[in-house]
A protein has these predicted regions:
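Feature captures the catalytic cores and cofactor-binding loops of soluble hydro-lyases/lyases
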Residues: 27-53, 57-58, 77-87, 180-261
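N-terminal glycine-rich "phosphate-gripper" loop used for MgATP/nucleotide binding
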Residues: 45, 61, 65-73, 210
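Hydrophobic alpha-helical segments and helix pairs
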Residues: 78-134
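Conserved mixed alpha/beta catalytic, RNA-binding, or beta-rich assembly cores of soluble enzyme
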Residues: 1, 15, 116-217
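Conserved active-site and cofactor/substrate-binding residues in soluble primary-metabolism enzymes
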Residues: 2, 6-10, 43-50, 58, ...
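Gly/Ser/Thr-rich loops at beta-strand to alpha-helix junctions
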Residues: 4-7, 68-71, 235
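N-terminal basic/disordered segments at the start of proteins
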Residues: 1-27
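General beta-strand structural signal in soluble alpha/beta enzymes
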Residues: 2, 23-25, 63-66, 95, ...
Length: 261
């Protein structure tokens, strides 16, 4: 079940390498997916019935949701009758309500929804410093406080990213996503901001896998941010070589931290 980006193609290739037969239902543009899958099925989130018929026709036994799904634009096309038919009338369009609806619908077809890490583990960022520079003492102070705040933010289901500078929290992530939060924080703080991304202990990796990549570093460079910290083993790193190049070029410290919460 493929959203936008390169992750669906990577997951499909890894699944096939491990002996799975892959039927890719593509809801967004996912470069490389058609070549990586055994079957490629263009799909629309506004035509759920066709997707369910396709799942049955391909005798799907397990599903993995990978990539970016544009929930706000897609589900705005549903009317109240559609929402009620999908079981959303009570739960609304929150991530939790959508996840519960999907799991229940697929369970009724004897389809298990798998953790994305099943096929994306090779790209999880291990503990350590990435690139030439480690954080300095002042940046570590911001990182420790950032993890405390971002952990609470993530646990409440609000967002995962905090931007701090000179002892002050300047931006918290909500619906806009990590990169836009970084840009907003950079505009408010000016050069020298520290970015921290946390993951809730109860995070459901079946439907979302926190990710950083070259776009994250570009957003940091635009605003003059100087350090990025993420929890070890819980966040995907895309475009590793490009991330290292950008970090070293801009003097940005990138660190993955054990016991970050």
């Amino acid at each position: 079940m493929a959203g936008a980006g390169t992750l669906p193609g990577r997951a499909a290739a890894e699944a096939r390498r491990r002996g799975w037969r892959v039927a890719a239902f593509a809801f967004e543009d996912a470069p490389g997916l058609a070549e990586a899958a055994d079957e490629f099925i263009p799909s629309s989130i506004t035509d759920i019935q066709a997707v369910l018929v396709g799942l049955a026709a391909h005798r799907v036994q397990a599903a993995v949701f990978v990539g970016k799904f544009w929930k706000s634009s897609a589900f705005s096309k549903y009317d109240q009758a559609d929402a009620a038919g999908l079981g959303l009338a009570q739960g609304g369009l929150s991530d939790a309500a959508l996840s519960q609806m999907v799991v229940a619908t697929l369970a009724g077809m004897s389809i298990e929804v798998l953790d994305q890490r099943e096929f994306l583990a090779p790209w999880l960022l291990p503990a350590g410093t990435l690139g030439a520079r480690a954080p300095v003492a002042a940046e570590w102070d911001e990182i420790r406080e950032g993890f405390r705040l971002a952990g609470r933010l993530a646990a409440d289901g609000v967002g995962q990213t905090v931007v701090r500078a000179r002892g002050v929290t300047v931006a918290l992530e909500a619906a806009e996503g990590t990169d836009e939060t970084i840009r907003r924080g950079g505009r408010l703080a000016g050069p020298g901001a520290v970015v921290v991304k946390a993951v809730a202990a109860s995070h459901d990796y079946r439907f979302d896998i926190p990710t950083v990549g070259a776009a994250t570093l570009e957003a940091m460079r635009e605003g003059g941010a100087t350090a990025l910290a993420v929890p070890a083993g819980r966040v995907l790193l895309l475009d590793r070589d490009e991330v290292v190049r950008l970090a070293d070029q801009a003097g940005i410290a990138v660190v993955s931290v054990d016991d970050a919460g």
